[in-house]
Amino acid sequence: MSNATNNTLGSLLPQLEAAANSNSLYGGMVPNLRFNITMIVIWGILLTIHVVQLLMRQYWFSIAFICTGILEVLGFIGRTWSHSNVADMDAFLLNMICLTIAPVFTMGGIYYQLAKLIEVYGHRFSLLPSPMAYSFIFICSDIVSLVVQAVGGGLCGVAVTDGTSTTTGNHVFIAGLAIQVASMAIFLMLWFHFLFRIYISVRWEHINSRPISLSLLKISQTEVDYLYREKFHFLRLEPKRWVFHYFNLAITVAVLTIFTRCCYRLAELVVGWDGYLITHEWYFIILDALMMAIATVTLTIFHPGFAFKGRSTSIPITPGHVDPETLPHTDDVEDILDTSDSKQFDIEKEEFQASMKYPISTFKQFMSKIANLFSSKKKAKL
């Protein structure tokens, strides 16, 4: 087995010990065959749709959603496999690893959409100085979360080898999930702050008053659009563009459902591997499988490629602290924000690579150090 598999196996040892009497890795519960096959079909359809959307719209960050689809399909294949043999370690690990990691990719895509929306509405609505900072900070946070979970798994593995308690490793593993939940909670606050600024604050600015009243709803988006960034008014005002008009609501639904799922996973581990949550599949069906399905179906209907007009419109994320609205020369702005159709895919690809370069290199360094640490301990024992 690889180091990653060994680490993950180590983190699951408390469950193995608790379920030893029933010879089941699911605490005595047997995954429902019909449900898990149904989920394989549903996720297979969603995965196919996102691949087609990527090819049609050339929207580079669709790859994040495709990765989620692949992991979900593999995860439910693992659960289907486990139905016939609940003691099969390979099937159990395929399920646990894939379904645990899958939401990270969806959230990575969502972080990037906030940066795009800040460019569409204007930098003044952003709490952070740079739109790309949202992607950078929260993608790094998710990677740190995965690293901490790997460390927890490694500690459990070493503890079992030494014949000591796995409690510390299990606590570290739970801490990794807690970091993910805390990171998403912070992102939710920043997201709702952004929504407050573009929907409430602009109306206060428009009427030069700050009433807290339903009368604000009578002010249409068209009336306040002059307070947004002029360059992308065509995205916001075109009457037939219902996908963009409801895009912010779609992102909100997706984030809240994924956040619910992550809270469930954290509670599941806190209660224990042999606890009530993990041994009753209905909790998994409603709070994990259904939540992820709702999030992905929502992002499939309100796909960013449709919301931002795919390759026909370029919305590059402004680097650093530069606000294009404050640049003195229009020509300079156009040079920085080149909207030629032929460059859209390359721009998206470069931004994706730029946002992931440092987080991935940091993740590799962490994992290398962890592998060396546990490898040296094993050699010392020999």
Curated annotation (Swiss-Prot):
Keyword tRNA-binding part of the UniProt annotation: no
Membrane topology (Cytoplasmic): 56-57, 112-135, 193-241, 303-382
Spans through the membrane: 35-55, 58-78, 91-111, 136-156, 172-192, 242-262, 282-302
Cellular component per GO, a single term: fungal-type vacuole
Major localisation: membrane
Regions of this protein lying in the Extracellular compartment: 1-34, 79-90, 157-171, 263-281
UniProt key word Transmembrane: yes
GO molecular function, one term: long-chain fatty acid transmembrane transporter activity
S-S bonds: none
Subcellular location: Cell membrane
Alphabetically ordered keywords of this record: Cell membrane, Glycoprotein, Lipid transport, Membrane, Transmembrane, Transmembrane helix, Transport
Mutagenesis / variant outcome for changing N3Q: Increases sensitivity towards LCBs
Pfam families per UniProt: RTA1 (PF04479)
InterPro entries, A to Z: RTA1
Glycosylation sites noted in the Swiss-Prot or TrEMBL record: N3, N6
Family: Belongs to the lipid-translocating exporter (LTE) (TC 9.A.26.1) family.
Role, per record: Catalyzes the ATP-dependent translocation of sphingoid long-chain bases (LCBs) from the cytoplasmic site toward the extracytoplasmic side of the membrane (flip-flop). Involved in the establishment of the functional lipid asymmetry of the plasma membrane. Regulates intracellular levels of LCBs, sphingolipid precursors that are growth inhibitory at increased levels.
Name the UniProt record assigns to this protein: Sphingoid long-chain base transporter RSB1
Organism: Saccharomyces cerevisiae (strain ATCC 204508 / S288c) (Baker's yeast)
Lineage: Eukaryota, Fungi, Dikarya, Ascomycota, Saccharomycotina
